[in-house]
Amino acid sequence: MKVVPILLFVLLAALQYRLWFGKNSIPEYVAMEKSVAEQAEQNTELLQRNNLLKADIQDLKVGLEAVEERARNELGLIKQGETFYRILPSEE
């Protein structure tokens, strides 16, 4: 009669060991869940960035305003008849 409770206790201990320390244990599950959440956040950020780049590409294909804006900012475009002013911050 004493064998059955001991056998059940050993079985329970083995199952608990696998649950906490074995392959696919609870700590591994928690770590994987955290990793998935971080990856989902990174995917959301990259999706937003991709959408901005797609909009920028579409604007460059369709409109000349974006091309002119880039030429002014990156290449220093000044049209004929325009005067360029640069305002520097005061040094104090």
Curated annotation (Swiss-Prot):
GO BP term (any one): FtsZ-dependent cytokinesis
Main location: membrane
Membrane topology value: Single-pass type II membrane protein
InterPro entries listed in its UniProt record: Cell_div_FtsB (IPR023081), FtsL/DivIC (IPR007060)
Pfam families: DivIC (PF04977)
Membrane spanning residue stretches: 4-21
One cellular-component annotation, GO: plasma membrane
Keywords per UniProt: Cell cycle, Cell division, Cell inner membrane, Cell membrane, Coiled coil, Membrane, Transmembrane, Transmembrane helix
Family, as annotated: Belongs to the FtsB family.
Known role: Essential cell division protein. May link together the upstream cell division proteins, which are predominantly cytoplasmic, with the downstream cell division proteins, which are predominantly periplasmic.
Descriptive protein name: Cell division protein FtsB
